[in-house]
Amino acid sequence: MLTFLIPTAKEMKPVPPCYPHQLPQKSLPILEAMAELSLEELARAYSISIEAASKEAKRLKAIAQGQSPAYPAYQLFNGLMYRHLKRDNLSKAQQDYLSKQVYITSSFYGIIPTDEKIAEHRHDFHTKVTINGQSLKHYWRPIYDQFAKDHKQIISLLSSEFKDVFSKEYQKLWISPKFMEERSGQLKTHSTISKKARGAFLTACLENNVQTKEALKQLSFAGFCYNEELSTETDYYYIKKES
């Protein structure tokens, strides 16, 4: 069975219904460390304005007091990749695929199933906070590595920010899809191409119930097709040809 890893997104959009929120035990020290920061320190930790930090402080307080509503993570996150992922009108099989084979890597919640109920929050691995003297990456690394150890065939749709939380010995075992577009005879890639393509790729996987590496190579989605010439054992290249 294939296991997919995807990143969080800064943009969030609450979609009813909401649910009670239960913060995982491992997330509590992070919440406590963030709650100890002054408004100025919080602004520096997030690299945002005081006004924006005030909004985050209220969110953190609501989470700490158990008053924050929670939403399925794949519905709450609303970045470019998530907007290009099929999230509505899923069949039972597609919903099962999304909730049982796709996991979100979070600097606040750890590695969670896509349908895990989470609260609105602002947090990533660039957030400047230490937990018992450790950076966020070092704090989560044992748990991330254990996940990689327990899941033999990982398909990584992670950016380097999230990928680097894992020890390199696990990273080198993954399959990492790469997405490029052909323009004026040249192959181009940038974050917008990659983010949109990740969502379309994952949609194709759940719609076709892809379970093997060979099936990944047969996929065609949003104009992208597998390119055997560029691909390696661990990097699968998908190219969108000029029309």
Swiss-Prot record:
One of its GO terms (biological process) is response to hydroperoxide. InterPro entries: YaaA. GO terms for cellular component: cytosol. The lineage of its organism: Bacteria, Bacillati, Bacillota, Bacilli, Lactobacillales. This is UPF0246 protein SZO_18530. It comes from the Bacteria. Belongs to the UPF0246 family.
